[in-house]
Amino acid sequence: MRWGCHLPRTSWGSGLGRTVPLPDELRIQSSWPFKGVHHPLRPPRAFIRHHGNSADSAPPPGRHGQLFRSISATEAIQRHRRNLTEWFSRLPREERQFGPTFALDTVHVDPVIRESTPDDLLRPSTELATGHQRTQAELPPLALSQLFDPDACGRRVQTVVLYGTVGTGKSTLVRKMVLDWCYGRLPAFELLIPFSCEDLSSLGSTPASLCQLVTQRYTPLKEVLPLMNAAGSRLLFVLHGLERLNLDFRLAGTGLCSDPEEPGAPAAIMVNLLRKYMLPEASILVTTRPSAIGRIPSKYVGRYGEICGFSDTNLQKLYFQLRLNQPDCGYGAGGTGVSVTPAQRDNLIQMLSRNLEGHHQIAAACFLPSYCWLVCATLHFLHAPTSAGQTLTSIYTSFLRLNFNGETLDSTDPSNLSLMSYAARTMGKLAYEGVSSRKTYFSEEDVRGCLEAGIKTEEEFQLLQIFRRDALRFFLAPCVEPGHLGTFVFTVPAMQEYLAALYIVLGLRKTALQRVGKEVFEFVGRVGEDVSLVLGIVAKLLPLRILPLLFNLLKVVPRVFGRMVSKSREAVAQAMVLEMFREEDYYNDDVLDQMGASILGVEGPRRHPDEPPEDEVFELFPMFMSGLLSAHNRAVLAQLGCPIKNLDALENAQAIKKKLGKMGRQVLPPSELLDHLFFHYEFQNQRFSAEVLGSLRQLNLAGVRMTPLKCTVVASVLGSGRHPLDEVNLASCQLDPAGLHTLMPVLLRARKLGLQLNNLGPEACRDLRDLLLHDQCQITTLRLSNNPLTAAGVGVLMDGLAGNTSVTHLSLLHTDLGDEGLELLAAQLDRNKQLQELNVAYNGAGDTVALALAKAARKHPSLELLHLYFNELSSEGRQVLRDLGGSGEGGARVVASLTEGTAVSEYWSVILSEVQRNLNSWDPVRVQRHLKLLLRDLEDSRGATLNPWRKAQLLRVESEVKTLLEQLGGSGH
């Protein structure tokens, strides 16, 4: 997978909020939880705003005209509205992650709907070519309120068919339309009755009248059923998902029936409704996939509308603004307080908007509203994880569930093949071939080769045509990047890696030898027992030496095939592990940063100059493969018709563990180590992780930006381990107190803990105090240098040190302690009895407090070394400290300068290496001043000694100091 300047292509699944926007008019339907408060967003063009809220207001009383004026009818309609509101307001778990106030009628952006004609429907499918753009150029757009307007000839429109490919938002559009009616926003209809064609098809041929179908689903409407005939066009039936229902409009197949109380097959009832033979004045809205449009003869349809998604970038931006600006979006799981601030949300939206403007490929992806949902869910996952156990793989699996759950490729086909299963076999093959050959751009021949592979019958060809019309655009998009025009790419890069992993774990990848071996194995399995029995009898009767050999061969065949399959699994595991630990990319970020960069438009990992420009990196492929083996994702995939057998999952996991055990023992760069941990996080199997990571002794994540998600990943994978970690290095990780709190189970296992350069303030010291006081704490070395702890923080920290029995080395270098902090340390140092080394250098302390701390250190029972260099010490103060440290009374040695009398301090290299390491982060003017003072000490000591060996040592150290000064001077200081 390459994460770089091109971005994933993004849109969202089976339904996300949308508005009916036109190129010259945008319509926003929004209602907020607080009455009278309008959302501040303003699209660049005029729009109409509607108000209402399902969260805290009951549906308004309907305007029933002359039809439903009776009290009983009015109450029945009101109960019906309330029931529909409750039912259609329920959101799947995947939507609830965006905050408790998120609701479909709170913020909604309708997709573009464009009117089409029967002639357009008869044109050959252009598959992935720019068919949508052609439609947009030729046909006018429609608003929801215009669907039943008279046609161009002035004729009344009674039946409207809306069609769109998978992911364009048909389901959400229907839900939003029903909720609009419930809140009085569709005054043209006094009664709305929605039907799910999936529900109707489940009834089979069981006879039921239209009245029974209505009352079984909407009990309150019993009161108004007698009035349906008189309702006319003010009665609206909504038939959602026509592709699920087999309709036969032939008179020989479905007889005429005009009585709503006459029982019949549900499909026959719908046919007579659509024929306008039953309730001829009623209005009907039908939604369907493109392949099923022809099931209704065009003479029964007054208007066709194509749902075209978010063809305008402004709609995409508006969707992201409304979705990501939810007030309750971004709070951590379990009340941990981790949240995305309004400023951070605004920054995300601005970066995403700039990316949409600058990179046409992500805009092409966001053409489908479902992929807009995926982008929002991914950003939410990366920046504000909300639920324990949520993984990147589960987001993609849920995304497919939202779009494909229960979807069959063709309801008329007896095989009842699931649409997702067909996609896994065809698109998964293309995706895996791309990963294997390291490419993301595919020619038309590549696509056709994977789609048409193995097709032999007319039925298989028909299924392929349905898939092309209904779902191909969901997975593939024309590439609009310069230099790759005429090729196709997966809608988002990560989808290629997900499908490739799915193709593997489903066992769809088989070599020719495996296919032949499987057939032989199945044949032997069918006849093996009988043949073995016959051979056994014959061998006893006739002295034929060949028969025992044949008998043994029959036993060997299953074992040979099993080994062949096992070798194939090991080969895949080997390729996956090698992909995960590739280091070819220069400045390779971890996969989470790569994914965020690709969505937000931040430049991704730079390539090494000698690397071929076409080389692709697919580091998410192993992550998805691991995630798909988790129990949760396997359960969801089974719902989609893609079951992964438990035995297959176990054997795949064993093969992966075998390879990881070998590769995982090597020392990895920090970003690669985080990828390794993320692999285990995706798997969600603590036993597997404990066995593979049992040999891990050093956790070096220095320089990795530890977001809340990454802290959760590390804590989840390593928090339950039992063996100690020799060193945990979290230097320069942008850690905050919340991150420290999350990582507490891991920090308790550390012996050496490095938290340098993390901008940790006094509030972080409370977590550090709790860490030090924990009865399982085994930290011996704690490095907190270059953090603004201040005197307030060190006071809290001393409370932890007072009760701690493990820490022997503590570094508080450059922690803004000042005189107050060192004075506090001097007063409370005796509360700890185990400390052996204390570094409080570069803290702005003066002579008095430095001397007081040095005296306290000399009295400490265990302290051996105290670092005080680079403080605001005078020449006299440094001399007093040198004299104190050089006295023969025992106690801690005090290091305040590069010299000890007329000799070089044995700690001179420690001091200068610390300066060199922090040269870019410390104040250059202040460092330069301190180095000049140290240089003066060296020169004075050199002038005061006659020992040539000491002079040579002093000259060498002077040279090192001058080199550092030149580096600072070369930087303009």
Curated annotation (Swiss-Prot):
Residues 73-554 are annotated as: Required for interaction with MAVS. It is found in: Mitochondrion outer membrane. It comes from the Eukaryota. Residues 1-84 form a transit peptide. Gene3D superfamilies: P-loop containing nucleotide triphosphate hydrolases, Ribonuclease Inhibitor. Keywords: ATP-binding, Host-virus interaction, Immunity, Innate immunity, Leucine-rich repeat, Membrane, Mitochondrion, Mitochondrion outer membrane, Nucleotide-binding, Repeat, Transit peptide. Residues 158-481 form the NACHT domain. Residues 904-968 form the LRRCT domain. It holds the Pfam family LRR_6. The keyword ATP-binding applies. Participates in antiviral signaling. Acts as a negative regulator of MAVS-mediated antiviral responses, through the inhibition of the virus-induced RLH (RIG-like helicase)-MAVS interaction. Instead, promotes autophagy by interacting with TUFM and subsequently recruiting the autophagy-related proteins ATG5 and ATG12. Also regulates MAVS-dependent NLRP3 inflammasome activation to attenuate apoptosis. Has no inhibitory function on NF-kappa-B signaling pathway, but enhances NF-kappa-B and JUN N-terminal kinase dependent signaling through the production of reactive oxygen species. This is NLR family member X1. It comes from Rattus norvegicus. The lineage of its organism: Eukaryota, Metazoa, Chordata, Craniata, Vertebrata. The gene is Nlrx1.
